[in-house]
Amino acid sequence: MSWRWALARRVAALGATSGGGDGATAQAQRLFSSAAALLGRHPPPPSPPHYQIRSKVVGCRGATFVSSRWLHDAQYQVRQDGLSRSEEQQDPFELVADELSLLANRLRSMVAAEVPKLASAAEYFFKVGAEGKRFRPTVLLLMASALKFPLSDSTEVGVLTILANKLRTRQQNIAEITEMIHVASLLHDDVLDDADTRRGVSSLNCIMGNKLSVLAGDFLLSRACVALAALGNTEVVSLMATAVEHLVTGETMQISTSREQRRSMDYYLQKTYYKTASLISNSCKAVAILAGHTADVSMLAYEYGRNLGLAFQLIDDVLDFTGTSASLGKGSLTDIRHGIITAPMLYAMEEFPQLHEVVDRGFDNPANVELALDYLQKSRGIEKTKELAREHANRAIKAIEALPDSDDEDVLTSRRALIDITERVITRTK
């Protein structure tokens, strides 16, 4: 028997000795199931029930971080001011700064390649100074902390700490995998868009050419697949594979739209989900699944990521019209110059139907670009897009507020940080 299974059985034994009778035996079985899932194995015992407390979702598929009352009998009360946004906020990025540095170093080692040119291309956006804000890894690390359960004060806390550290490493792996998939999509997008800047520096295709950029993106995806397979969780593998499929689907939707589709807000939002929100939402859900949470809690994590991603892209589309090339780290008016119609222009078209004809003519002629911008300036397109972004931000915040009750300060701090990130997304200027 491996040490992993021995450890899992030890946790189950702890549950069995915490009380007598059939209830203790069933609880031990649930703990064994959770520990086994954490360590990459999936035995088939039935899932435990989950509970509803007021409007909060409470429950887990088995305790990974175990309280003295074995979690399923615990009902933690969130302090009334626990998630108050009026409290002094800590910088969300600073909360996980040490882990982000660790992840950055691991990512640089993970993308090393035997062929020097491929290695140089693959590590281009992982080099110090070019790695960007690391927005997605930050969100995922904070989500992992926001979903954790407190360790007990028992004498067996050392065993539980081993499990906790093991889980944290696996959740860090999700952050690494997500960032590799994201960077791969950027490399491919820059080739498709013939972009010359990214993150304030020259794009890889501009420096090394399209062929090497495409190969570097493929290489990153292959490394992400290897890391994903190593987790040994088929549900998580399926989620992340779906996110990659959505990236391809969204990009295809963008480059092959009909006239009717270009005018459709529903089509735009579906494409935006595929291109931007699917990766972060499914990654948030993967973090919850690895921790052994119920489907309800995992869906709250997903909903947070989905609405955060949509809000992020809506503001990004606003900034394409209102920002500068220097502030955005890429060219402004990029979308419209490529004939891509986004929310601000869609709202302007609703307000000024004559704009449809301008859009249908395309934007190869600079005069059409200027005419479309004139209509946009007269409309409420920018304002209505910001309002829609706020709606999605509010939904993301509600998802965090509906997470299982906890009185753990680290958990509450992380949840406040996720709410803070949401507010930053819709108030950013770059």
UniProtKB/Swiss-Prot annotation:
InterPro entries with a match to the protein in the record: Isoprenoid_synthase_dom_sf, Polyprenyl_synt, Polyprenyl_synt_CS
Catalytic reaction list: 7 isopentenyl diphosphate + (2E)-geranyl diphosphate = all-trans-nonaprenyl diphosphate + 7 diphosphate
Molecular function via GO: all-trans-nonaprenyl-diphosphate synthase (geranyl-diphosphate specific) activity; geranylgeranyl diphosphate synthase activity; metal ion binding; prenyltransferase activity
Cell compartment(s), UniProt: Mitochondrion
Enzyme class: transferase
Binding site for Mg(2+) 2: 189, 193
GO biological process: isoprenoid biosynthetic process; plastoquinone biosynthetic process; ubiquinone biosynthetic process
Enzyme Commission identifier(s): 2.5.1.84
GO cellular component: mitochondrion; polyprenyl diphosphate synthase complex
Principal cellular location given in the protein's record: mitochondrion
Mitochondrion in keyword set: yes
Pfam families cross-referenced by the UniProt entry: polyprenyl_synt (PF00348)
Binding, Mg(2+) 1: 189, 193
Binding positions (isopentenyl diphosphate): 133, 136, 182, 199
Amino-acid positions noted as binding an all-trans-polyprenyl diphosphate in the UniProt annotation, renumbered to this chain: 198, 275-276, 313, 330
Expression tissues: Expressed in leaves, stems and roots. Highest expression in roots.
Keywords: Isoprene biosynthesis, Magnesium, Metal-binding, Mitochondrion, Transferase, Transit peptide
Essential cofactor(s): Mg(2+)
Cofactor details (free text): Binds 2 Mg(2+) ions per subunit.
Associated pathway: Cofactor biosynthesis; ubiquinone biosynthesis
SUPFAM superfamilies membership: Terpenoid synthases
Transit peptide: 1-31
Assembly, per entry: Homodimer.
Protein family: Belongs to the FPP/GGPP synthase family.
Chain's role: Involved in the supply of solanesyl diphosphate for ubiquinone-9 (UQ-9) biosynthesis in mitochondria. Farnesyl diphosphate is the preferred substrate.
Protein name: Solanesyl-diphosphate synthase 1, mitochondrial
Species per Swiss-Prot/TrEMBL record: Oryza sativa subsp. japonica
